[in-house]
Design a protein with these regions (language model features):
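N-terminal accessory beta-strand-rich subdomains and adjacent acidic, glycine-rich linkers
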Residues: 4-166
Length: 166
């Protein structure tokens, strides 16, 4: 089992620290250089087959990497976009990986299927246990048509930066 294994990565400027814990569940937390942002929060993916990635999963290996690239962006508001982060990929014996990236101003994660063939996902558990006093900006999708745009629920799915934040 991956009981009590803990992995940590920091953003390139060391202002954010992500801690990933493996035990009976996979949990992660985020800390800035001044305060706790996210308390340990569980992550899991349930497959149609009944398997659950993130529950009693066994670590097979860990790889760390660094990205420091600049990309041309001819149709964006900036000419060049920096891509700087530190990353970790945790491989699990159950045929999946969990990848985290820590940027100077953000954290991202994803589950990656390593097994051949099709993988059907039944659901995902992504909890966000914010520490007291933490501030978050959340884009909401309305479940009824909006007066000003008239979009139905299914037509509202888009990039999060295109939606209303509250």
């Amino acid at each position: 089992m991956c009981r009590d294994k803990t992995y940590t990565i920091q953003s390139p400027d060391c202002s954010l620290t992500v801690t990933i814990g493996c035990g009976d569940r996979i949990v992660y937390s985020i800390r800035s250089d001044t305060s706790q942002i996210l308390k340990p929060s569980p992550l899991a993916v349930r497959l149609v087959s009944g398997e659950c990635w993130g529950r009693r999963s066994r670590v097979a290996g860990v790889r760390r990497y660094r990205i420091d690239e600049v990309h041309d962006a001819p149709v964006y508001k900036k000419r060049k976009v920096e891509d700087r982060c530190n990353g970790i990929v945790i491989d699990f014996r159950e045929g999946f990986s969990l990848e985290f990236r820590a940027y100077d101003d953000a954290v991202a994660y994803r589950f990656v299927a390593r097994q051949p063939g099709e993988v059907l996902v039944a659901g995902e558990e992504a909890r966000f246990r914010f520490a007291p006093g933490a501030v978050a900006f959340v884009p909401y999708v309305r479940d009824t048509p909006c007066r000003h745009d008239g979009l139905a629920f299914g037509e509202q799915f888009m990039q999060s930066f295109e939606n209303t934040y509250t």
